């Protein structure tokens, strides 16, 4: 005999919300799904070039803990002046 009440609740009309606006409904185990980017505003699907400002995890870690090599930046600047 299978166990009773072990499956999550299924919401056939779950709302997908982007920027406070309901963009679509899908079936899900959550009643609301909040997203930052979806196919309606993604640059690939809309054909627009939009820069999404993200930085790599390593860069963010190095900047956070002050491990960025400052000499490297100075060397790059002096190399650019020589050219």
UniProtKB/Swiss-Prot annotation:
Keyword Ribonucleoprotein: yes
Keywords, sorted A to Z: Ribonucleoprotein, Ribosomal protein, RNA-binding, rRNA-binding
Statement: the UniProt record of this protein carries the keyword Ribosomal protein: yes
Gene Ontology MF term list: rRNA binding; structural constituent of ribosome
GO terms (BP aspect): translation
UniProt cross-references to SUPFAM superfamilies, sorted A to Z: L28p-like
Family: Belongs to the bacterial ribosomal protein bL31 family. Type A subfamily.
Its biological purpose: Binds the 23S rRNA.
Name of this chain's protein: Large ribosomal subunit protein bL31
Originating organism: Gloeothece citriformis (strain PCC 7424) (Cyanothece sp. (strain PCC 7424))
Origin organism lineage: Bacteria, Bacillati, Cyanobacteriota, Cyanophyceae, Oscillatoriophycideae
Gene name in the database record: rpmE
